[in-house]
């Protein structure tokens, strides 16, 4: 067994002294995953994957099953917590140049895609009005694929429309994907500890390290406590804060909701999809909104790893963050002026971040004579 693994077993994993709170979100994601697995199992025990019974089974869980309401709310709001943590975790990776650790970054991006797929399948399961129409809109994007599109859509649906087979396979996928997430998370952590964590300065940490326990373990526990308090506060006092009113009506294929929109954590991607008035173009932009993350290790031209000493890149990063929020906001609005224009400009700026990344690096190298 390699030397580092032995150290890890004893909690003596060496960690940079100067890593900030932004490095705590990895352990928080692990806690979220554990919570989702436990609550998900107890919900699956009582859930019925049938289009006539799914909606009623959710009502049965919340009303009749002991602490079922708590399991259901913890699972739904836990998913939101999961995405809050993963978006902060990715933003930290972007800001501090963690993407230069290629294997870890690629496994992390794959984890994000798997998480998004799992969340989408889970959103369909209650078979509410918004679940049904969100599934219809998103799965319909497959038809935009030339030649294979229609065949793939029919294969995914299990028929010529979204029906009982669709719900059954979505439940099966929602159940099995988290096991893939667990496996890939283990690989992600293993690959990270091959090289070790970065630090805010983006320098080599070898000269100044401390043991993981007790320093980082207590820091992790503090952040986990804060997250638990937030989660339980929302579950207890504002359980429907992330819900859509249409989710409380049973799916009706004959009535289209006024405004179809996904959960808040998919709004940025949905906004990018909607900003392009072409089905295939929108589907490609949607895919690229995530896939662009994979280009970052190859487009990093700066001699400095972290953005801590790169003012131009900091401005670009915070513009990107604001753009992300603006796209999410416009995606909640109807498709009419001025929202269409705002969303198109924001989508363009979103992709410009990835294009400007190498240019900014080169420019900063010139200015600082590196």
UniProtKB/Swiss-Prot annotation:
| Bilayer topology annotation | Multi-pass membrane protein
Q: Which residues bind heme b b566?
A: 89, 188
Per the record, the domain of life is Eukaryota
Q: Where in or outside the cell?
A: Mitochondrion inner membrane
Note describing how the cofactor binds: Binds 2 heme b groups non-covalently.
Q: Which residues bind heme b b562?
A: 75, 174
Query: A Gene Ontology CC term for this entry?
Result: mitochondrial inner membrane
**One function term, GO molecular function aspect:** ubiquinol-cytochrome-c reductase activity
GO biological process: what's one of them? mitochondrial electron transport, ubiquinol to cytochrome c
Q: Which cofactor does it need?
A: heme b
Q: Which residues bind a ubiquinone?
A: 193
Q: Which Gene3D superfamilies match?
A: Cytochrome Bc1 Complex, Chain C (1.20.810.10)
Going by the UniProt record, its keywords in alphabetical order are: Electron transport, Heme, Iron, Membrane, Metal-binding, Mitochondrion, Mitochondrion inner membrane, Respiratory chain, Transmembrane, Transmembrane helix, Transport, Ubiquinone
Q: What is its main location?
A: mitochondrion
The portions of this protein that span the membrane are: 25-45, 69-90, 105-125, 170-190, 218-238, 280-300, 312-332, 339-358
InterPro entries noted in UniProt: Cyt_b/b6_C, Cyt_b/b6_C_sf, Cyt_b/b6_N, Cytb/b6-like_sf, Cytochrome_b, Cytochrome_b_C_euk/bac, Cytochrome_b_N_euk/bac, Di-haem_cyt_TM
What does the record's miscellaneous section state?
Heme 1 (or BL or b562) is low-potential and absorbs at about 562 nm, and heme 2 (or BH or b566) is high-potential and absorbs at about 566 nm.
How does the record describe its quaternary structure? The cytochrome bc1 complex contains 3 respiratory subunits (MT-CYB, CYC1 and UQCRFS1), 2 core proteins (UQCRC1 and UQCRC2) and probably 6 low-molecular weight proteins.
| Biological role | Component of the ubiquinol-cytochrome c reductase complex (complex III or cytochrome b-c1 complex) that is part of the mitochondrial respiratory chain. The b-c1 complex mediates electron transfer from ubiquinol to cytochrome c. Contributes to the generation of a proton gradient across the mitochondrial membrane that is then used for ATP synthesis.
Which protein family is it in?
Belongs to the cytochrome b family.
Its recorded name reads Cytochrome b
What organism does the UniProt record list as the source? Chilabothrus strigilatus mccraniei
Question: Gene encoding this polypeptide?
Answer: MT-CYB
């Amino acid at each position: 067994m390699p030397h580092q693994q032995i150290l890890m077993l004893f909690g003596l994993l060496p960690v940079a002294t100067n890593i900030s709170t932004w490095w705590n979100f990895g352990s928080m994601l692990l806690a979220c995953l554990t919570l989702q697995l436990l609550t998900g199992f107890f919900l699956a025990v009582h859930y019925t994957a049938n289009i006539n019974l799914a909606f009623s089974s959710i009502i049965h869980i919340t009303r009749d099953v002991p602490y079922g309401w708590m399991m259901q709310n913890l699972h739904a709001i836990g998913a939101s917590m999961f995405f809050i943590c993963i978006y902060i975790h990715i933003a930290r990776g972007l800001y501090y140049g963690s993407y230069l650790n290629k294997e870890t970054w690629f496994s992390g991006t794959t984890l994000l895609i798997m998480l998004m797929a799992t969340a989408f399948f889970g959103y369909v399961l209650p078979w509410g009005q918004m679940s049904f129409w969100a599934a219809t809109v998103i799965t319909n994007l497959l038809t935009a694929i030339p030649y294979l599109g229609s065949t793939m859509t029919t294969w995914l649906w299990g028929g010529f429309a979204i029906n009982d087979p669709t719900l059954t396979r979505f439940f099966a996928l929602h159940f099995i994907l988290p096991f893939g997430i667990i496996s890939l998370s283990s690989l992600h952590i293993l690959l990270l500890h091959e090289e070790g964590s970065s630090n805010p300065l983006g320098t080599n940490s070898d000269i100044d390290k401390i043991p993981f326990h007790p320093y980082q373990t207590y820091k992790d526990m503090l952040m986990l406590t804060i997250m638990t308090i937030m989660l339980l506060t929302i579950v207890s006092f504002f359980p429907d804060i992330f819900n859509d009113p249409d989710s409380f009506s049973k799916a009706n294929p004959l009535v289209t909701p006024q405004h179809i929109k996904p959960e808040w954590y998919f709004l940025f991607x949905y906004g990018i999809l909607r900003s392009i008035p072409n089905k295939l173009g929108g589907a490609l932009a949607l895919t690229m909104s995530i896939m662009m993350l994979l280009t970052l290790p190859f487009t990093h031209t700066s001699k400095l790893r972290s953005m801590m000493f790169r003012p131009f890149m900091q401005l670009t990063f915070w513009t990107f963050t604001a753009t992300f929020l603006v796209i999410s906001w416009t995606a909640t609005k109807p498709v009419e002026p001025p929202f269409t224009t705002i969303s198109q400009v924001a989508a363009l700026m979103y992709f410009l971040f990835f294009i400007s990344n190498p240019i900014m690096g080169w420019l900063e190298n010139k200015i600082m004579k590196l």
